Design a protein with these regions (language model features):
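Short, compact, well-ordered microdomains
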Residues: 82-109
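Proline-rich intrinsically disordered, low-complexity coils
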Residues: 2-4, 36, 79
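Short alpha-helix capping/helix-loop boundary micro-motifs
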Residues: 70-82
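N-terminal non-globular leader segments, chiefly Sec-dependent signal peptides
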Residues: 6-73
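Short intrinsically disordered terminal tails
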Residues: 1-11, 108-109
Length: 109
């Protein structure tokens, strides 16, 4: 029984550390949709800059070799079995601030 309590405590400690050290960034597709849809959450290290988080979110939600939504680095929550890549006009939510993907980078909304 003591081993079970230790395992449970370790599990809770790991979850707490993850919560304290990571941000969940939301990717919202709206360019070609009739209304904006959150399609993915990506866990990012809190020490990353906003620009680094935006660029990583863009990179991880674009298909280069394998379909991006099958990656274990992305929590895909889209309504379809497949999903297009993130494009100009889509959004990324970092904390409480939304950024629009523009032709050359990002613009705070």
């Amino acid at each position: 029984m003591p081993n079970q309590k230790v395992k449970e405590m370790n599990k809770k400690t790991k979850a707490l550390i993850k919560t304290l050290t990571t941000d969940n960034v939301a990717v919202i597709h709206s360019t070609f949709e009739d209304k904006p849809r959150t399609v993915a959450f990506i866990a990012m290290d809190k020490s990353m800059s906003v620009d680094e988080k935006l660029e990583r979110a863009f990179m991880l939600t674009n298909t280069i070799g394998d379909a991006w939504y099958t990656s274990d680095q992305v929590n895909y929550i889209g309504p379809e079995k497949s999903c297009r890549s993130t494009a100009v006009g889509d959004f990324v939510l970092v904390g409480k601030t939304k950024y629009e993907c523009v032709e050359a980078g990002w613009s705070e909304v």
